Amino acid sequence: MTHGTKFAALAAAALVAGAGAASAQDCPIKVGVLHSLSGSMAISETTLKDVMLMLVDQQNAKGGVLGCQLEAVVVDPASDWPLFAEKARELLTVNEVDVIFGNWTSVSRKSVLPVIEELNGLLFYPVQYEGEESSRNVFYTGAAPNQQAIPATDYFLEELGVEKFALLGTDYVYPRTTNNILESYLISKGIAKEDIFVNYTPFGHSDWATIVADVVALGADGKQVGVISTINGDANIGFYKELAAAGVSAEDIPVVAFSVGEEELSGLDTSELVGHLAAWNYFMSADTPTNAEFITAWKAFAGENRVTNDPMEAHYIGFNMWVNAATAAGSVEVDAVRAAMYGQEFPNLTGGTAVMLPNHHLAKPVLIGEIRAGGQFDIISQTSEVEGDAWTDFLPESAVLTSDWKDLGCGMYNTETKTCVQLTSNY
């Protein structure tokens, strides 16, 4: 059944039943899960597939959505970026899913964008990213740079007195764009360009000896060095092991990571990583009743040794907002759900409330955590909710842009010329 005919059927059912419940032939409602279960990103993405299965089970136990049970349709794009696009098309045209929750890397998301925009699919993307994008067909439930990268850099500057920066990233669009933003930001804060070392490595990189030696050498003049890491996937294991082998402690050269959380640390001996940092919008150690309930449910579903992390919370928030939006709209049709998403609120797991903004980003708190023995984090800094900014203020070409799908109907709006630059996301 096409999305259009499904919408017509839903509307007819609403008229007949008077309660907005989907008619029998529209059941089950299908939820696509697009996460790598093999390849270099499986270390991070497999757990996101698992949490989606838990959330679907929980919702079905509550009666489903619009009178229908939910059915999770899981595919494995295998850390293969073109395959993400193929699997997204398969989910929408063959499986006829009503919504997709998926992706980790930005290169995989950008591979999917043309497909979901062509077919009017709906993607909930749960991971921090570089910004510089706002698609009509994506809700970005992870952090934009102003909700992670910029606050973490401020912490290095203001709290740790870092004077020289090593920006280490995996070689793809998220680290490169984020580091472009950070380099511009650091220079605006008085850091000399020659005191900023930038290095990129491939996915799955394992030989870190030379790069760690280069980072150590930055401090030969006695200035405090700090590492900002946008390294993704299993390459993180080798990086942290090499730091330990080189005898580099957090007191010597602190590292703040944007893609390392509880899941990535669960496979490491963290005793020599104590004191290094990560910036997210959630940590498992958050001491709230809601988080305790979530952790208990997760361990019961997935196993006592399993941990929670930030992108899991993003899926938790996004999924529940989608359920509430579909319920409010009386339909799972994409355009109806999208319209009902704006202003959706849902309690986050750290004690506040997530709010969906007209730019398809969330208002979320910024947390900085310090690695402790055992692979958990001490939360050492937490803000109130920060509104996600799709277009950074720290790149001149982006500072004039804004996104407002609710009132302006545009994700790339020039505030100076008062025109919509473009509607599709082939930036």
Predicted regions and their residues:
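Solvent-exposed, acidic/polar segments of extracytosolic/periplasmic ligand-binding ectodomains
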Residues: 29, 345-427
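Immediate post-signal peptide segment of exported/extracytoplasmic ligand-binding proteins
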Residues: 22-33, 64-69, 157-163
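Gram-negative bacterial Sec-dependent N-terminal signal peptides
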Residues: 1-24
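Periplasmic-binding protein-like
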Residues: 91-103, 124-126, 164-169, 222-233, ...
